[in-house]
């Protein structure tokens, strides 16, 4: 009988730990489409880190997952609260300076700026809001369609791709 009780206690503790980790630390996610290709492809399995959101550690270039209605999307942060941003002739400008990152140059996006957002009064991103963009220019499931992404809708940043094994990646570089 003591073995059964010990087993049940161990099982309950394991379930509590798993629930805690999935609620506050990390969660698994399957990439549902090719919006972030070639960085992430449909069917890739990733770990989403929730801690960076909790402690306001999200950075430009981070790939995040976020909720929009009942759907979960994956995009890249291109501008954070307190910054301005614009695309001019395929080049991303942040705070009126060109961004030197692979995701920011030679894009098929000609002219796109904060002025495209109806919900925004000025040229600066308000607190707790982000501008996100997919790596695929023709897939507009990002700020071009949704507008600003509120921090409360962000699940976390993609910090590890564990499948397919041949593409194992930790911390995606911009």
Swiss-Prot record:
Location in or out of the cell: Cell membrane
Keyword Transmembrane set for record: yes
GO biological process: signal peptide processing
Keywords: Cell membrane, Membrane, Transmembrane, Transmembrane helix
Top-rank taxon, per record: Bacteria
Membrane-traversing stretches: 8-28
Record-level GO cellular component terms: plasma membrane
Database matches in InterPro entries: LexA/Signal_pep-like_sf, Pept_S26A_signal_pept_1, Peptidase_S26
PANTHER family noted in UniProt: CHLOROPLAST PROCESSING PEPTIDASE, SIGNAL PEPTIDASE I
The family this protein is said to belong to: Belongs to the peptidase S26 family.
Reported function: Catalytically inactive.
Listed name of the protein: Inactive signal peptidase IA
Gene name of the encoded protein: spsA
